[in-house]
Amino acid sequence: MSTVQVPICAPEESGSSLLEAWFELWLEASSATLGEFARALTRGPRTPLELARWLELVAVRDKPAWSTPHRVVWEGPLARLRDFSSPQPADVVSTLVLPPQAGHDSCIVDYSTDQSQMRTILEAGLERAFALDWVGATASTAHATIEDYIAVVDRAVAHAGGRVNLVGDCQGGWLATVYAALYPERVNTLTIAGAPIDFHAGQAVIHEVLDDLTPGGSLAFYKALVASGGGVLKGEHMLRGFILINPLDEYSRQLELLRNIDDAEHVARYREFEDWFKHTQDIPGAFYLWIVEHLFRDNALISGTLEVGGRAVDLAAIDMPLALLAGASDHITPPAQVFALAEAASTQPQAVRYELASGGHLGLFMGHEALAEKWPSLLSAVAAHSQP
């Protein structure tokens, strides 16, 4: 893999100070939440056994798992490729899914038997289906670059037949878009869900936070964050960031568990989500810093100034059919960030499909509404373009 220099110790003092301030903010939010927990425990009778059960459920996590039968066809240091194809698949163009890459397990695209993007793809008649499964960063992959990830996608495309329906969720969506711009001849259709293309559009909470943490465009805070992880971005930092965006969600989820501790179905749903949400994995530091600098800060993808491997990433090179899915209440990737691709690409208007779900970010990938009402419409259009 190509390499760039990743800091392994904290940089200038300003970055360290910002990092300390970030952790202080997280501790304050955590303390406030714990205070609410303490007050909640005093409301209404709870037996010692119920409280012990609640504490156990809050504290003990299992590794999340994929739910649909499949096989791993290859594995590398950055990703493994999972094949979900039917035993005797129809003769259709293969579909390749790039899951989110934000410090969580890729199995969000196959969350459960009744909340699975992969099953929805298969049920749409796209019976040749694959998903990349991002591998958590280690010291040996801390220097992985955007070029390395494009190479991973290209390897998966080659295995799937050389030309695919590319589906990208969240961070996997901008990666799919970059790949489609670089290699349009290898992408039959492009579908993105909750994926930022214009990173500065809409009222994104992440962009507001980034403005506060990059005074004068400085990346000192983010370099300090990577340095604190020994050259990788620790997944636990990403988790804390997500919780800080809306700490009341965290508090409400734990309190609802306490209120429904005797409801077996509620407990099962809680464990399923917490096992995925709280199981974190690390991201290569070089790759993460590149994302922050070129995409979140500079917005280079939509402005046309992005380069990968010495090549310009020209969104106008994208001329294949597009399917775009956004969430009306998505504060992480507002709809304007997703739908910006239609204006930047060269795809004819009649070949662009839009869907807007009512929920937020995660619901786009595993929510009942999106999977039952939005994805089937988009995937039917993809399937129509996928016949031999």
Where are these regions (language model features)?
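Alpha/beta-hydrolase-fold enzymes
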Residues: 1-37, 161-162, 177-286
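Short, surface-exposed "cap/lid" segments of acyl-processing enzymes
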Residues: 58-138
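Gly/Ala-rich beta-loop-alpha elbow adjacent to hydrolase catalytic centers
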Residues: 167-176
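Short beta-strand/loop motif that positions the catalytic acidic residue
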Residues: 318, 324-326, 330
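Alpha/beta-hydrolase active-site loop
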Residues: 141-159
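Catalytic histidine-centered segment of alpha/beta-hydrolase-like enzymes
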Residues: 358-373
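Catalytic histidine neighborhood in serine/cysteine hydrolases
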Residues: 345-362
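Conserved alpha/beta-hydrolase "acid-adjacent" motif
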Residues: 331-337
